[in-house]
Amino acid sequence: MTRASKRKSDVQNSAPAKSARADSIRSASSKVSAKGYQRIDEIFNKYADKTSGMIEPEGIEALCSDLEVDYTDIKILILAWKMNAQKQGYFTQDEWRRGLKALRVDNINKLKKSLPELKKEALKSVNFEDFYLFAFRYCLTEEKQKCLDIESTCILIDLVLGFQYPVQVDSFIQFLKIQSDYKVMNMDQWKNFLRFCEEISFPDLRNYDTCEAWPLLLDNFVEWFKKEAV
C-alpha cells in the first residue's frame, strides 16, 4: 500500500470514531439539559392546571404565596417580562422554562432569592423602556386590543413608574381621573409619558414645547397642570 493510500485509509477509519465522539458529547449535553428542564418542569407542574397545561391565575396566586410576594407586586410583572409571557395571568411551560433558565434557577428557594436582582436588572436604564412597554402589552387581555382603560392605566403606571417619578405620576393620575375626553390610553401615549418623565423639567415644565410631537393627551395634561398651579 502506498503512503497516500495509507493516509486516506487512516482518515476514513478516524471519521467514524470522530462521529461517535460527537454523538456521545451531544447525548451527554442533551441529558444534562433534560435533567435541568426536569427540575424546572417539576416546579411548573406544581402550579399548572392539569387541563390547560398552563399556570393560570389560581396557580400564580399559589406561586406568589410560596415566593412570599403579593400578587400585585411589581416583581411578578418583572418575572413575566423575563419569561416574555404573552397573556396576563398565565404562564406556558415554554415561557416558564425560558424565564427560569435565564435566571439559572431550578427550585422555588432559588427563584425567590433571584427576584431582588431581577428587579434591579429590569430597572436598569438599558432595560427599563423594554420592561415599561412590555407592561402595557401584557395588560392587553383581549385579542386585537390596542388600548387600556383609564382605571387600569392609573394602576399600572403607578406600579411601574410611580417609585421613579412620584410627582409626575401622581399629578398625571389625578388628571386622568378627572378628565372626560379620554376613556382609554394607547401605546403611543403610554410610551410618550415615559419620555415626558425623563425629558421634561417638572413641575416648572420650562422645556415642554407644545409644537413638538407630543400626544394631545399630554398637551392637555400640561395645560391642566399649569392652571392647577396658579
What does each model-found stretch correspond to?
Residues 134-182:
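Conserved binding-pocket/active-site segment within a compact domain
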Residues 109-115, 149, 170-171, 204-208:
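Short, tandemly repeated low-complexity microdomains enriched for cysteine and small residues
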Residues 121-125, 157-162, 180-184, 199-200, ...:
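Eukaryote-specific, cytoplasm-facing alpha-helical/coiled-coil scaffolding segments in long proteins
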Residues 50, 66, 70, 121, ...:
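Surface-exposed polar/charged interaction patches
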Residues 55-69, 91-105, 148-163, 187-200:
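Amphipathic regulatory helices of Ca2+-sensor modules
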Residues 2-52, 57-60, 73-82, 87-144, ...:
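EF-hand Ca2+-binding helix-loop-helix modules
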Residues 115-121, 172-179, 208-219:
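Short amphipathic alpha-helical linker/capping segments at the junctions of internal repeats
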Residues 184-187, 191-230:
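C-terminal interaction modules of eukaryotic adaptor/scaffold proteins
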